[in-house]
């Protein structure tokens, strides 16, 4: 988000070229993502749809949009999937983010504890580390969900809301936080997408 706040549909070069039959314009600036799937950290670049041009038989990305007419089906789908309901979908998304972050911590806490050396997180005891991770991840997931669903996230947070993120000060800790935020956001947004379509 920080690199390209206006980005709407991102994919790597090969997906735009091969699956979508679109070309990435020369000189386009990619969005750098940290990728450790190969066993060592490297940058992986994705491009927004606005960086692409069309060819014959090219495909447009199918972007869903949330609006107030979809409030009830989206809220019902979220309640069915996560067991959390609220009269305001924005608050329901925030509550779901908190629940899923807690579940993520329960499943991945040992891996996260193993990478805090050298970061500002290493000064925390076990409970403090858990609190910082949950705070940073929950606020980041909530922001991502609200932004994608078209809510104005700036009205939900103040300048101190994102303070916990600054403790993630090494590439490993940033990657761990980013992976958690990405995985959780993707899961919830797919639930919303199914309800919208």
Model-derived segments and spans:
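N-terminal accessory/interface modules of nucleic-acid-binding and processing proteins
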Residues: 1-197
